Curated annotation (Swiss-Prot):
Recorded topology in the membrane: Single-pass membrane protein
This protein's name: Triple QxxK/R motif-containing protein
Keywords: Endoplasmic reticulum, Membrane, Transmembrane, Transmembrane helix
Gene Ontology cellular component annotations, sorted alphabetically: endoplasmic reticulum membrane
InterPro entries: TRIQK
Function: May play a role in cell growth and maintenance of cell morphology.
Annotated source species: Homo sapiens
Transmembrane portions of the chain: 51-71
Domain of life: Eukaryota
């Protein structure tokens, strides 16, 4: 019986360490949460490079369409035909 009772009693040093650990965890919990949120926001944020690449691709596409229609719709004037001949 003596052994069973002795095992359940914790040393005051162990109780003190446990209490200090709980207090430390309570102090660092908001800091850890803020750090996690900051890392997640940084991970999911769109960078300037990606935005620049998308804008450059759209601009290149628009210029290609413009060049295609400009070259397609311009009429070639033959120098052999004189329009002033009536």
């Amino acid at each position: 019986m003596g052994r069973k009772d002795a095992a359940t009693i914790k040393l005051p040093v162990d109780q003190y360490r446990k209490q200090i650990g709980k207090q430390d965890y309570k102090k660092t919990k908001p800091i850890l949460r803020a750090t996690k949120l900051k890392a997640e926001a940084k991970k999911t944020a769109i960078g300037i490079k990606e935005v620049g690449l998308v804008l450059a691709a759209i601009l290149a596409l628009l210029l290609a369409f413009y060049a295609f229609f400009y070259l397609r719709l311009t009429t070639d004037v033959d120098p052999d035909l004189d329009q002033d001949e009536d």
